[in-house]
């Protein structure tokens, strides 16, 4: 038996071959699929890491057209709250608005506004046996500023002379009503006066600012969340579904394991319409088995991340480009999207990953340096950095809701009982996420122009690679010159 199967390559080993083109970069379309049922307007996904993705970054990325996967090093309630924050940030019509009953106090309103970062709350009667809520008024933060006592009933300050609209109103008409009446919130009711929804002027403005935002059928930003394989995982999934999550990622270092297959099947059995990403894998056999278990997308990548030490500690893995290509052959048979997770340093790597067969790319370090990431900001020798750590690092695994199960390790009170497969470090701060995304997508569009393709599908089907030498790689980077001013899309520290 031949132990050496084949040579395996990664992004730096190849270049895309330019082709005849009548396509300009600005004419390309970068819309792609995340899962069987979810499309993204840009093929970028943020990693489920505790120094990368929480609500703030997930909101920014969804507004740009991608999607964020909120990490699971959080309590179940907190992770669900993070998802809900994304879902409520921007809506067409808020179908189940946060509300107060008539016997609530002003302090209740203050607490609710602070907890959910909102500025107005409908006031309703206690629900009927059918669960209907009769609208009585609305209280806004302006009303709260006009009162001295927080113990008074909310009915003493709420506005009762309401401007409302009936179900089925379109957003253009709603905007006209808001403008004419100089109000910020339009309450939606049915013929009986029961509360059915809420449209805010702020949401309408947000839609105009980000026309390419990744949204669900109700006009809400899309959000994903990671889950593991612990005993309480289904409780976590229940809470995430209640919060409105669009997709859950069964997130482990080795997706081709029975525990992951069982968890995917369990989730799909209880929530058949919920989209489930499963991973990580590096072989076509793993893709086949996860698809059979019910996965709606498969995440590819064993050890390519900048903070991952799996290939060194365990001696196991697969160079990322070959892993994508091998997995894509199997995924194509069932039309299941692939997510290339890890190893992305530059926008050119995104183009290579997609050309190799991925439908989207998941990135950690690229986004960890943005202002919106939850990592700590560090000032070192006059430069700004952000903390960045692998989910296999000691710090991440030692958290109360830590990631040890991602690496199939038992929870322990002693850090020395963990065998880490990641490190902790810092990366240069990069500024706002939308500026980073602009450069990444600009680079991808440039690649598509060079290759003469208009869509991601054409990029996958109509491109070829050449293998390069170490000398070719050196020639590809700036050489024989001292860089005096770094470009926004190229850094020697990448």
UniProtKB/Swiss-Prot annotation:
IMP binds at residues 306, 341-343, 364-365, 388-392, 421. The active site is at residues 308, 406. Its EC number is 1.1.1.205. One of its GO terms (biological process) is GTP biosynthetic process. Mycophenolic acid (MPA) is a non-competitive inhibitor that prevents formation of the closed enzyme conformation by binding to the same site as the amobile flap. In contrast, mizoribine monophosphate (MZP) is a competitive inhibitor that induces the closed conformation. MPA is a potent inhibitor of mammalian IMPDHs but a poor inhibitor of the bacterial enzymes. MZP is a more potent inhibitor of bacterial IMPDH. Pathway: Purine metabolism; XMP biosynthesis via de novo pathway; XMP from IMP: step 1/1. Its cofactor is K(+). It catalyses: IMP + NAD(+) + H2O = XMP + NADH + H(+). Residues 93-154, 158-217 form the CBS domain. Keywords: CBS domain, GMP biosynthesis, Metal-binding, NAD, Oxidoreductase, Potassium, Purine biosynthesis, Repeat. K(+) binds at residues 303, 305, 308, 475-477. Catalyzes the conversion of inosine 5'-phosphate (IMP) to xanthosine 5'-phosphate (XMP), the first committed and rate-limiting step in the de novo synthesis of guanine nucleotides, and therefore plays an important role in the regulation of cell growth. This is Inosine-5'-monophosphate dehydrogenase. It comes from Chlorobaculum tepidum (strain ATCC 49652 / DSM 12025 / NBRC 103806 / TLS) (Chlorobium tepidum). The lineage of its organism: Bacteria, Pseudomonadati, Chlorobiota, Chlorobiia, Chlorobiales.
